[in-house]
Regions:
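Bacterial N-terminal signal peptides
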Residues: 11-20
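Catalytic-loop region of hydrolases
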Residues: 26-115
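Short glycine-enriched nucleophile-adjacent loop
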Residues: 171-182
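Conserved small/polar residues in nucleotide/adenosyl-binding loops
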Residues: 202-209
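Alpha/beta-hydrolase active-site loop
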Residues: 137-155
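Alpha/beta-hydrolase fold nucleophile elbow
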Residues: 158-167
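Active-site nucleophile loop of the alpha/beta-hydrolase fold
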Residues: 190-198
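Conserved alpha/beta-hydrolase
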Residues: 112-127
Length: 209
């Protein structure tokens, strides 16, 4: 018995070393892929109790998507990685994204579907506020274009099914995003979405244009 344990010990150590190297390689692969995405900067590794890898990144967005002369700003995005072959949940937050930085945070659909998560802070909130802060460009349309840019950028990494979701104003954002870009995601799951008639009429007219 002792001889068997002595024989297995070096094998076990070698196996554990191989696992360590493999995990480190996967992490480096993801970070390199993030670094290679257009418009992505400020990549920071985050701790997570639920995801294999989690990063805070910033994506450069036009302040006004129809007027490049208005300048750019950086929008905060949290990327939680499960696998390149897994579905991706696009969280269309309606406010700030600070709570998603918590290591214990796990989005519900991401948990149910064993899916990646791309969590987008709404423009003009917290660290996604342009400088100078011109409120003229805080529109639902610009927000939808922000999400479209995020979607198209991260589709280079995650080529599977995409699901957009949000709660309250985030649910509203999910609906409006789908109105402007109906083909960006495969499913939209708003958790409560307060909308008024004026908003719906404006969105319908703008999307038709």
């Amino acid at each position: 018995m002792r001889r068997t344990l002595k024989t297995l010990s070096p094998c076990l150590v070698a196996f554990l070393l191989m696992l360590t190297v493999a995990f480190a390689g996967n992490a480096q692969e993801l970070q390199k892929k993030l670094e290679g995405l257009k418009g992505i900067s400020g990549i920071e590794k985050l701790e997570s109790d639920h995801y294999a890898e989690k990063y805070l990144v910033r994506i450069t967005q036009p302040v006004d998507h129809k007027n490049p002369a208005a300048g750019t700003f950086t929008q905060r995005v949290i990327v939680a990685h499960v696998g390149f072959d897994r579905p991706t949940i696009l969280v269309t937050e309606g406010y700030g994204a600070a709570y998603a930085l918590n290591p214990r945070y796990q989005e519900e659909l991401s948990k149910l579907l064993d899916a990646n998560m791309v969590f987008v802070e709404y423009r003009y909130f917290l660290e996604s506020t342009p400088t100078p802060c011109n409120w003229e460009y805080l529109t639902a349309e610009n927000s939808a274009y922000d999400l479209h840019n995020v979607n198209q950028t991260f589709r280079e990494l995650y080529t599977g099914k995409w699901v957009s979701t949000g709660i309250s104003k985030g649910g509203q954002t999910t609906c409006l995003y789908r109105a402007w870009f109906p083909d960006d995601v495969d499913f939209s799951v708003p958790y409560v979405a307060p909308l008024n008639r004026g908003c719906l009429l404006y969105t319908s007219d703008a999307a038709d244009d």
